[in-house]
A protein has these predicted regions:
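Conserved catalytic cores of phosphodiester-cleaving nucleases, focusing on short active-site segments
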Residues: 170-185
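Short solvent-exposed loop/turn micro-motifs enriched in small/polar/acidic residues
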Residues: 163-167, 212-213
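Short alpha-helical "patches" and their helix-cap loops
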Residues: 115-125, 211-223
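Metal-dependent nuclease catalytic cores in nucleic-acid-processing enzymes
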Residues: 194-218
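Domain-level recognition of nuclease-like catalytic cores that cleave nucleotide substrates
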Residues: 219-258
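Metal-dependent nuclease catalytic cores that hydrolyze phosphodiester bonds in DNA/RNA
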Residues: 1-165
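Active-site-adjacent loop/helix micro-motif of nuclease/hydrolase catalytic cores
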Residues: 186-196
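Hydrophobic, Leu/Ile/Phe/Ala-enriched alpha-helical segments that form helix-helix packing faces
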Residues: 132-148, 200-207, 248, 252-255
């Protein structure tokens, strides 16, 4: 019993990965990169990534309680109310971004089982951090408008989980693509591409499989690089799809789609 990301850490992939990142079509520097070097930021890179993702969802039209639902649940598990932070998030001003960072810091309570004693509130975000997040959220919205329409964000896979993989959620489902946001100064890795492939297969096995009938590509948008990375599903071998279905996710042979 593990999450998608936990399962990936325990899987030995073939040389280059089930989907070699070199297979990806790359559209470099489509969007403006953050103005300040990452080294100027004073908030953990992972937390910046989560904040950028959730703020993008919220400002793209997802209700704030849904966009930050995992973080809200994390606060509640520690006996804290999220209302004061939620009320401070109204846009992309520094006050909103700082509140979003603090709220997103509670994600780890749900995803990693962090306790109250282990949780440490992040320090106040400096100007470089706020400016970079502002830029990345803005370009992420531009990306979603260009590659949309977005059908769903924060995607679960009801009926698609197994005894091996019991949790995991994707970022964005569009009319013809399944997209993940990765806020990193590096290009995608084989773990990132496997994560996307698992999401698509789990979606195809889920009770919401009809939403995936027209998905033609898997892709990653990296707002720190301003770049888009994608692969056509038709370019993936049936052998690869079957191996990930059965050996990685844990579907039975008789239930395999490929």
């Amino acid at each position: 019993m593990c999450s998608v990301t936990q399962r990936i850490k325990s899987v030995k992939q073939p040389r280059g990965g089930f989907i070699n990142p070199r297979q990806l079509d790359v559209e470099s520097d489509l969007y403006e990169r953050p103005r300040y070097p990452q080294e100027d930021e004073n908030i953990n890179a992972g937390l910046i990534g989560i904040t950028t993702d959730y703020l993008t969802r919220y400002l793209f039209g997802t209700p704030i309680e849904v966009a930050f639902s995992v973080s809200i649940e994390g606060m509640r598990r520690l006996g804290k109310s999220p209302l004061s932070l939620l009320n401070k998030i109204n846009g992309l001003d520094n006050k909103s971004i700082s509140a979003a960072i603090k709220l997103a810091s509670y994600d780890c309570v749900v995803r990693n089982g962090i306790t109250a004693a282990m949780h440490h509130a992040p320090e106040k975000a400096n100007q470089s951090t706020c400016e970079n997040i502002r830029t990345m959220v803005t370009t992420s919205r531009d990306f979603l408008f260009a590659y949309g329409p977005v059908i769903e964000s924060g995607i679960g896979f009801p009926g698609g989980y197994t005894d091996v993989v019991t949790s995991g959620d994707g970022d964005y489902l569009t009319a013809n693509g399944l997209w993940d946001m990765k806020v990193s100064k590096r290009a995608p890795t084989k773990d990132h591409t496997l994560q996307l492939l698992m999401y698509w297969l789990m979606g195809s096995h889920s009770s919401l499989n009809y939403k995936y009938a027209n998905v033609e590509k898997l892709g990653i948008y990296n707002p720190r690089l301003g770049s888009v990375f994608s692969v056509e599903i038709d370019s993936l071998s049936k052998e690869t799809l079957h191996q990930v279905e059965v050996d990685v996710i844990g579907y039975k042979e008789k239930d395999a789609l490929f």
